[in-house]
Every structure is written in structure tokens, then in C-alpha cells.
Amino acid sequence: MEKMRGHVLAVPFPSQGHITPIRQFCKRLHSKGFKTTHTLTTFIFNTIHLDPSSPISIATISDGYDQGGFSSAGSVPEYLQNFKTFGSKTVADIIRKHQSTDNPITCIVYDSFMPWALDLAMDFGLAAAPFFTQSCAVNYINYLSYINNGSLTLPIKDLPLLELQDLPTFVTPTGSHLAYFEMVLQQFTNFDKADFVLVNSFHDLDLHEEELLSKVCPVLTIGPTVPSMYLDQQIKSDNDYDLNLFDLKEAALCTDWLDKRPEGSVVYIAFGSMAKLSSEQMEEIASAISNFSYLWVVRASEESKLPPGFLETVDKDKSLVLKWSPQLQVLSNKAIGCFMTHCGWNSTMEGLSLGVPMVAMPQWTDQPMNAKYIQDVWKVGVRVKAEKESGICKREEIEFSIKEVMEGEKSKEMKENAGKWRDLAVKSLSEGGSTDININEFVSKIQIK
């Protein structure tokens, strides 16, 4: 077996939005001469489509729910406790298994939601780095909440003027979110003991917030974790995420349809892999977009919330409703005029990296803060105003926001700004760019001496 510069074990939290960015980082490490092993829970491993040609090794671990995964757990706290118990044992087994090989594990890169992985790394004498899948701004807000025992006072010094509606929802948790709130705060219990703190962002995008975070921990921004062939093109084999939890059948239909649409004419609507909208909100969206050409991704689990008979009324020549779409291919298609998004960090980074203006409709977690930055800091979109009491975005507000981005007074400026962020994303990943320098610094510290 070929001797590598080192061997990184990557341990993501078991959901698609966390698995994908760490896997992409593994590809960067592999391109620098590192062996990388990516762990997946048994349940996730059995439900995804893996690219067999990928250079990234896979190892399975247990979360205690091998047959049913997260949804079969009795509660969030129960799942997290069992994941810690079973996960730490099975990760330790993988480390031991490689100890006597030519490429023993030298570093663990673990999801920041799993601080127990750092304790494990220290037990084995390995280097370790938490991987934060949210922006520097959100991480800094969460850190402030942690050191202030879960509370925040507005305004927050050194950050843009924030209102309550701009904060991550877990910072102002309701009863149902308390377990997630605790998980967010626990990211910071031992992160100061890690060798590095990795953040899926890039220097120019999060410049000020990165500086704030660097005062409390050794931050390295290593994003965007978008496949290389869409940006810097240094890794020729990296043209997709190469694993997916969803059906891939509709990809060709989607891209063929887009190729026939005029440039900048289509509104792309997608709310990620987890967001659950109410029937009322779905009806408002359906009504708001009726005068536009659109591609709307409605997951199978959400389809029943569409207005009765809606799918039969869709003009197939002008619009398309699908259960899944190849998002990178869609966003990079010239037909797309704007991206109506829930503002999950991965989707936000894809929109920025591919230069697409956005209509922001945040739902929960870090999304409200991402929406704030989309509109007021990066100036690449408009946040749809929601009703204060119900939280519903009404059709008039949705339609107005789409028009603002597609053809409004500031439309040209938003498109130019989106192009600027795309150029800076490419620059950061290219040789000598900020992300490339940071990844080189990381590998120089963890390689076998």
C-alpha cells in the first residue's frame, strides 16, 4: 500500500447537510496527498447512493439505530446520547483497526455537534479539529450565547445591526428546540483544546466575523465546499457531491428542460432536505409564482401540502415541479434568474459560489441570520417579509421579492454582487488563495513528520 502524508478520519453528524461538506473537504485533503476515511452510520450507509470510483474510503459506525436511524429514536436527547455511546465505541474500533497498517489514522476531523470525538482523539494521541458547517457569523453568535449561559443582548457589538428575527432560532429556543439548543451550545465545551477549528466559509465572505472568532480559537476557513469543477477546477474528478440520500432519476429531465429556457428567466425554488413548510405556506408560494417561469422542488414528503389540483394546473412549457433536482447543475444553468431558498448554509454557499441572486425565505436554525447577510451584508438578494404572528410569508410579499430580484431597481446590483462573490470563491480555492493557504497550513501540521 502506498504511504500517504497522513490519514484523516472524518466523522460527520449523520444528516446530508453535515455529511456533504466534510466529504468535500476530504477530497481536498486527498488531493494534497492524504488518505481519508469518511465514516457514515450504518443506517445512512444503507440508504445513500455512493460513487464507487471515489478516492475517499468509507467506514461504518453505529449511532445505536442501525435499522431506523434518527427517526426511530424516542427523542432528540435520547438519539444524541446513544450516538455518543455507540459512536465513540465504533470510531475507536476504526482507529485501532488502522493502528498497525501502513497508514495509521493521524487526525480526526469531526462535526462540531459531536465534541465527544475530541476526547476520543486525545485518548489516542491524535490531532483533532472540529468542523463547523455554519458561517463564522452564526458560530460567533452561538459562542456568545454559550459564554453568556444561553442568553444574548441586542445589539451585539462588532456585528451588523441585528433584530430578534435575524438570530438563529436556537438562540431563542422554544420548548421543542431545547435539545438542539443544547447541542449548539455544547459545540464550544472543549473546542479551545482542538488543534484547529475548521469552518465551511471563505476569508473574503466572512472576513470580519472570522477575525472575531479567531480571538477565541484557532480558526481556519476551508470553504466553500462546492465541487472543484464548478469553481477552481484543480481536482478534475470532483464534479459532484458523489453521494446522495435522494433519488437521482429526475436529473436529466430537469437539465434538459432548463436548457430550453431563455437566459435568466427561471425562478428556482428549493427548501433543502429537511425544511417542512405548512400547507398554508405552500399555498401562498403556489399562488405567488403563478406568473413566473419556475422550477420548484417539492420533496415527496411535502407533496400532500400542495393546494388540491395544483400539479394538474402547472403549465409544463413554462414551469416544472419535481421531487428532487441536481442543485449544482441547476444553479449553474444560464436559465436561472434567481434562487428562492430556505437559506440553509450549504444552499447559501452554493448560491454565492455560483453567482445566483437569492430570494430568502428562512425557516429555522441558522437560516434567519444567513438571510440577513444575503440581503444586508452581501447584498445578493431580498428577504421575504413574514407575518409577525403566524410567520407565514404571504403571496404578495413573495411575488414582490421575486420581482425585486429578477427585474427591480436593485436587480442589476444584486447580480453584479453575486458575480463578485463567485469570483472571490474561485480565488479562495485556487492556488495561493486564502482557503488553499489554510488547507496547506492544516495539512502541514497534521502530516506524518
UniProtKB/Swiss-Prot annotation:
UniProt key word Glycosyltransferase: yes
Active-site residues, record numbering mapped to chain: 18 (proton acceptor), 111 (charge relay)
EC number in record: 2.4.1.237
Keyword line: Glycosyltransferase, Transferase
CDD domains reported in the protein's UniProt record: GT1_Gtf-like (cd03784)
InterPro entries assigned to the protein according to its UniProt record, in alphabetical order: UDP_glucos_trans, UDP_glycos_trans_CS
Molecular function terms from GO: flavonol 7-O-beta-glucosyltransferase activity; UDP-glucosyltransferase activity
Family under the similarity heading: Belongs to the UDP-glycosyltransferase family.
Protein name: Flavonol 7-O-beta-glucosyltransferase UGT74F1
Organism of origin: Arabidopsis thaliana (Mouse-ear cress)
Protein encoded by which gene: UGT74F1
